[in-house]
Amino acid sequence: MDERIDPDELLAAVGFDADESVLTRRQAEVLALREHDIRQSDIGELLGTSRANISSIERNARENVEKARQTVAFANTLTAPVCVDIEAGTDIYDIPPTVYAACDEAGVEVNYGSSNLLQLIDDAVDGAIQQDTVQVPLRIDVTNDGVVHVRGQSAERTE
């Protein structure tokens, strides 16, 4: 491990503030060090704990980051002027025209071409697209400034 790496300096460089984060300081330290390709055992040695504890801290941190992403996506959904539900079984090439039509109706300009929109969907929801078909119900939201957010939806929804 590079002895010159200081977790405090890493966190200061990115402006981490534990009071404003869903991560604990220790979780942020572990993630920052892992992003610098430091092995868990070396991080444990640096922070005075076991590799197993570092593994647990990292796993919890990544879960917290994913929960935060989902929370932001939910908050964006509440204010997005464009919300499009895509059913499982939909041909992926039907998605862009559907999204663009909804955006036109709302007077919102989407910032993605068809191929980039489909790539965004595929990247956002694991297993969403297989063999040119949507595998899980999706919610596609577009903000006033054209930013697209994609979430997988539960197949069971109550009205």
Swiss-Prot record:
Keywords: DNA-binding, Transcription, Transcription regulation. It comes from the Archaea. One of its GO terms (molecular function) is DNA-binding transcription factor activity. InterPro entries: RNA_pol_sigma70_r4, Tfx_C, Tfx_DNA-bd_arc, Tfx_DNA-bd_euryarc, Tfx_DNA-bd_sf_arc. It holds the Pfam family Sigma70_r4. Transmembrane segments: none annotated. GO terms for biological process: DNA-templated transcription initiation. Belongs to the Tfx family. Putative transcriptional regulator. This is Putative transcriptional regulatory protein rrnAC0199. It comes from Haloarcula marismortui (strain ATCC 43049 / DSM 3752 / JCM 8966 / VKM B-1809) (Halobacterium marismortui).
